[in-house]
């Protein structure tokens, strides 16, 4: 399976290749997967004090806002709202009116680039996103499934891997939240989330919009970083291989079935125990 790879905010292709390097080496070694990287088209400058954190310039984003995110990204780490559910936390952090204005063009421009990448390489059938790149990747999955239901479009993305991340953006340029959307996303997905990630609720809200029977939760036992060493890396590679193996040859017909909302994750969830979640309702 060939994956389209999307870096995080203030990232670039060289930096993301390094971040994913150990996983890619293991998966390419035995031919399990191949990878195509694209770079965001929105040129940005890291927030003051974060220049070294994001590495050498240039820096890019996939989601274009109206200038507020540079401040909010830093402030969000310090004051991420406490709430009973990830969805409530996201609504408090990103009020709907602010999102509709601040991200008015973000979704359309990101989708334009991602569909161009799919058109340019017919072998791509999977997607990987890190942090903001996970939101952009999820936005593509969300749009493909909306188009499938409305116009019979056959989705290209058959599997998705999200490192941390945020929910997809809807046509209204607001986060797709599981307690607001009509349909969950029925695509095999792997969600890597760290218990110490300051943006954990964003990743949990992203996980919650995917069908429980097709989503796998992977505890990275860390923060907002990608596993790159030791046993955790081996387990990640194994999880990716399992994801690829579980993708049906043609799942377009299955996607037409209505989603059934199952167990969702709340903000107080004990992440180390989440690996057992998928088996509770089996």
Swiss-Prot record:
Query: What GO MF annotations does this protein's record show?
Result: hydrolase activity
Summary of the function given for this chain in its UniProt record: Esterase; part of the gene cluster that mediates the biosynthesis of liamocins, glycolipids (also called heavy oils) composed of a single mannitol or arabitol headgroup linked to either three, four or even six 3,5-dihydroxydecanoic ester tail-groups. Within the pathway, EST1 catalyzes ester bond formation between 3,5-dihydroxydecanoic acid (provided by the HR-PKS PKS1) and mannitol (provided by the mannitol-1-phosphate 5-dehydrogenase and the NADP-dependent mannitol dehydrogenase) or arabinol (provided by the L-arabinitol 4-dehydrogenase).
Task: One GO cellular component term, please give it.
Answer: cytoplasm
Q: What induces it?
A: Expression is induced by the cluster-specific transcription factor GAL1. Expression is also regulated by the cAMP-PKA and HOG1 signaling pathways via the transcriptional activator MSN2. Moreover, expression is also increased at low pH by the pH signaling transcription factor PACC.
Its Gene Ontology biological processes?
secondary metabolic process
Q: What is this protein called?
A: Esterase 1
Q: Which organism is it from?
A: Aureobasidium melanogenum (Aureobasidium pullulans var. melanogenum)
The record ties this protein, via Pfam families, to: FSH1
Q: What's in the keyword line of the UniProt record? A: Hydrolase
Enzyme Commission number: 3.1.2.-
Q: Which family does it belong to?
A: Belongs to the LovG family.
The biotechnology note for this entry reads: Liamocins have high bioactivity against the pathogenic bacteria Streptococcus spp. and can be potential new specific inhibitors of oral streptococcal biofilms without affecting normal oral microflora. Liamocins are also able to inhibit human cancer cell lines such as breast cancer cell lines T47D and SK-BR3 or the cervical cancer cell line HeLa.
Catalytic residues as annotated in Swiss-Prot or TrEMBL: 131
| SUPFAM superfamilies associated with the record | alpha/beta-Hydrolases
Q: What is the deletion mutant like?
A: Completely abolishes the ability to produce any liamocins.
Q: Which gene encodes it?
A: EST1
């Amino acid at each position: 399976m060939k994956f389209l790879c999307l870096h995080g905010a203030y990232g670039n292709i060289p930096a993301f290749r390094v971040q994913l390097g150990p996983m890619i080496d293991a998966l390419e070694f035995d031919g399990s997967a191949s990878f195509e990287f694209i770079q965001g088209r929105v040129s940005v400058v890291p927030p003051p004090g974060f220049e070294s954190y994001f590495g050498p310039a240039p820096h890019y984003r996939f989601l274009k806002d109206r200038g507020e995110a540079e401040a909010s990204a830093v402030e969000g780490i310090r004051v991420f709202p406490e709430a009973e559910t990830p969805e409530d936390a996201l609504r408090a952090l990103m009020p709907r009116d602010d999102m509709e204005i601040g991200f008015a063009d973000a979704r359309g421009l990101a989708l334009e680039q991602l569909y161009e990448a799919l058109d340019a390489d017919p072998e791509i059938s999977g997607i990987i996103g890190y942090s903001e790149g996970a939101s952009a990747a999820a936005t593509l999955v969300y749009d493909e499934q909306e188009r499938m239901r409305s116009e019979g479009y056959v989705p290209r993305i058959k599997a998705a891997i999200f490192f941390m991340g945020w929910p997809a953006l809807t046509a209204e340029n607001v986060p797709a939240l599981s307690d607001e959307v009509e349909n969950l996303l029925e695509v095999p997905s792997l969600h890597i989330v760290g218990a110490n990630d300051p943006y954990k609720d964003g990743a949990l809200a992203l996980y919650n919009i995917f069908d429980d029977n097709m989503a796998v939760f992977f505890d990275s036992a860390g923060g907002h970083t990608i596993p790159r060493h030791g046993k955790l890396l081996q387990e990640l590679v194994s999880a990716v291989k399992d994801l690829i193996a579980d993708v049906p040859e043609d799942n377009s017909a299955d996607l037409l079935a209505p989603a059934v909302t199952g167990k969702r994750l709340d903000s107080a969830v004990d992440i180390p125990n989440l690996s057992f979640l998928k088996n509770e309702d089996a």
